[in-house]
Regions:
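Conserved alpha-helical scaffold segments that buttress catalytic/binding sites
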Residues: 1-216
Length: 216
């Protein structure tokens, strides 16, 4: 949404949407608190949305919220609004992927996922860390998907990250090194540094159609 002159392109409206879905059990209980907690934190830091940004509030997650979210995302993209969706559980991202099935994904997460590997368009992987499922790894190599480890990105090794022209950006916060994000779920020592992630994503020449953040 930033033009070559450095000014925001007001034709692209940013719509921030919270989806406070909750897990039934396990270490991610409390995920529903993330959207409002992030809003509170940004207010304390006196961080405001850009002029072309609007806060759409939180989606009502009672009942069949996934169908409602899918319809809303499709509508927003069709009217040239870029939805920035804050989960909630990883199910939130799954709905976004279903709503926009023909778009490639840039996925920043430590472990590769079957559903992302099996999409029609190749996924770009940022910050892979640890042992990957062998069958998933075979597909990544067979399809020549672009990938990088957290260490490669942090050490700025000579790797080429070719961004698709249009894509969905999915950031799962478990990709961040535990030392920089102690409140996130999932131990990831040796994960990517926050400033590295911002730098790498910011340098990608890509028209983001939707951004989804999970794992908060």
């Amino acid at each position: 949404v930033i033009s070559n002159s450095g000014e925001a392109d007001l034709l692209d409206v940013l719509g921030v949407l919270g989806v406070p879905s909750e897990v039934d059990k396990g270490s991610r209980i409390g995920a529903s608190l993330a959207p409002d907690a992030l809003r509170k934190m940004t207010q304390q830091l006196d961080t405001k949305l850009p002029a072309n940004g609007i806060d759409l509030g939180n989606l009502d997650v009672l009942g069949d919220w996934s169908s409602s979210l899918m319809e809303l995302i499709s509508h927003l993209v069709n009217v040239d609004v870029i939805p920035i969706v804050i989960g909630g559980t990883s199910d939130v991202a799954n709905v976004i992927l279903q709503a926009l099935p023909d778009l490639p994904v840039v996925a920043s997460m430590p472990l590769a996922r079957h559903d992302l590997v099996e999409r029609t368009e190749n996924t770009v992987w940022l910050g892979l860390n640890g042992e990957q499922p062998i069958e998933v790894w075979d597909q990544i190599n067979t399809r020549n998907m672009v990938w990088s480890t957290a260490r490669q990105l942090d050490e700025q090794e000579a790797i080429t990250i070719k961004a698709p022209k249009n894509a969905i950006l999915w950031i799962d916060m478990s990709v961040i090194d535990l030392g920089h994000a102690a409140g996130t779920i999932g131990l990831n020592p040796g994960g990517i540094k926050p400033e590295t992630l911002v730098s790498v994503v910011g340098a990608m020449d890509c028209n983001w159609k939707s951004i989804v953040i999970t794992g908060l």
